[in-house]
Amino acid sequence: MRRQLRSRRAPAFPYGYGYRLDDQDEVNQNYLADEEEEAEEARVMVVPDLEEEEKEEEEEKEEDEKEEEESHHQDTRSAWWQKLQIVNEYLWDPEKRMSLARTGQSLSLLLVIYFFFYASLAAVITLCMYTLFLTISPYVPTFTERVKPPGVMIRPFAHSLNFNFNVSEPDTWQHYVISLNGFLQGYNDSLQEEMNVDCPPGQYFIQDGDEDEDKKACQFKRSFLKNCSGLEDPTFGYSTGQPCILLKMNRIVGFRPELGDPVKVSCKVQRGDENDIRSISYYPESASFDLRYYPYYGKLTHVNYTSPLVAMHFTDVVKNQAVPVQCQLKGKGIINDVINDRFVGRVIFTLNIET
């Protein structure tokens, strides 16, 4: 600063003038003050100029970005428009008068070729199906060598085959009673006497004639189940802790018990103490499916056929604990030990009677 003052000091006046040294200092101070004011004004002017330049640069960047986005959208639109034009020209080209890159004559020829091709294919398939159906009888299965031995089912329905109920609480067993009553409606004595015939027991009921001829069915009356018929005890023993469970074999067309011996039913404790079940009564008393209900001729001709039943009356079962029960079919040709299928020749369920 002192150097600037020295360089800008006012010129020396000749001796002829009457100025004093104090006047020279005052002049130098005035120069210094003027320079400071100019510097301050320059600083004040420079700051707004820089801010304005930054704002202008930001605005220019934003404008450039907008222009880039608009150009990108325009490029995208133009690309889509070009694709649509290509598709439109492929579907119909008015200049060449072509559709799908083919003339009308070539398209007509192509349609004719495809028509005859698919018509021939449909005719071959129809002929094969017709020939196949000629060899299949709707009344008798063609292939029976792979049919498994009969499986079994029980009534009433129970969730997971677990019969859990409390004797003193009717709400816990009433649904079993309703299920049994509904299932046995088709076995009512009056209905069986009206629809089916009274067949002699102990022998097959073989009916000759055409396979499409209606077949007769033997009576299986509800009264055959005695204490488990619901006629004498409407609760089927559930109110006294002596439940009845009905078992039937699945129907198989043409099935006959081998050697002329009826298939029997046997129940026991599956695992655990065998004394958990001390007494079981079977109805009919033979605990078997009589031969007169076989063979079965199929639902198309054996319309009124009624599957025979065996009722198990569990009269003395340990209470207040779960008892696993297994009921098996016994007879020649019957398989009842398949591990992977618990319903082939046997059924397993649980009794849990609370008091």
Swiss-Prot record:
<keyword id="KW-1133">Transmembrane helix</keyword>
<dbReference type="GO" id="GO:0005890">
    <property type="term" value="C:sodium:potassium-exchanging ATPase complex"/>
</dbReference>
<feature type="topological domain" description="Nuclear">
    <location>
        <begin position="1"/>
        <end position="108"/>
    </location>
</feature>
<keyword id="KW-0812">Transmembrane</keyword>
<comment type="similarity">
    <text>Belongs to the X(+)/potassium ATPases subunit beta family.</text>
</comment>
<protein>
    <recommendedName>
        <fullName>Protein ATP1B4</fullName>
    </recommendedName>
</protein>
<feature type="compositionally biased region" description="Acidic residues">
    <location>
        <begin position="49"/>
        <end position="68"/>
    </location>
</feature>
<feature type="transmembrane region" description="Helical; Signal-anchor for type II membrane protein">
    <location>
        <begin position="109"/>
        <end position="129"/>
    </location>
</feature>
<dbReference type="GO" id="GO:0006814">
    <property type="term" value="P:sodium ion transport"/>
</dbReference>
<keyword id="KW-0735">Signal-anchor</keyword>
<comment type="function">
    <text>May act as a transcriptional coregulator during muscle development through its interaction with SNW1. Has lost its ancestral function as a Na,K-ATPase beta-subunit.</text>
</comment>
<feature type="topological domain" description="Perinuclear space">
    <location>
        <begin position="130"/>
        <end position="355"/>
    </location>
</feature>
<keyword id="KW-0539">Nucleus</keyword>
<feature type="region of interest" description="Disordered">
    <location>
        <begin position="35"/>
        <end position="76"/>
    </location>
</feature>
<dbReference type="GO" id="GO:0006355">
    <property type="term" value="P:regulation of DNA-templated transcription"/>
</dbReference>
<dbReference type="InterPro" id="IPR000402">
    <property type="entry name" value="Na/K_ATPase_sub_beta"/>
</dbReference>
<dbReference type="InterPro" id="IPR038702">
    <property type="entry name" value="Na/K_ATPase_sub_beta_sf"/>
</dbReference>
<keyword id="KW-0472">Membrane</keyword>
<keyword id="KW-0804">Transcription</keyword>
<keyword id="KW-0805">Transcription regulation</keyword>
<dbReference type="Pfam" id="PF00287">
    <property type="entry name" value="Na_K-ATPase"/>
</dbReference>
<dbReference type="GO" id="GO:0005635">
    <property type="term" value="C:nuclear envelope"/>
</dbReference>
<comment type="subunit">
    <text>Associates with a SMAD7-transcriptional complex. Interacts with SNW1 and TOR1AIP1. Does not associate with known Na,K-ATPase alpha-subunits.</text>
</comment>
<dbReference type="GO" id="GO:0006813">
    <property type="term" value="P:potassium ion transport"/>
</dbReference>
<dbReference type="GO" id="GO:0005637">
    <property type="term" value="C:nuclear inner membrane"/>
</dbReference>
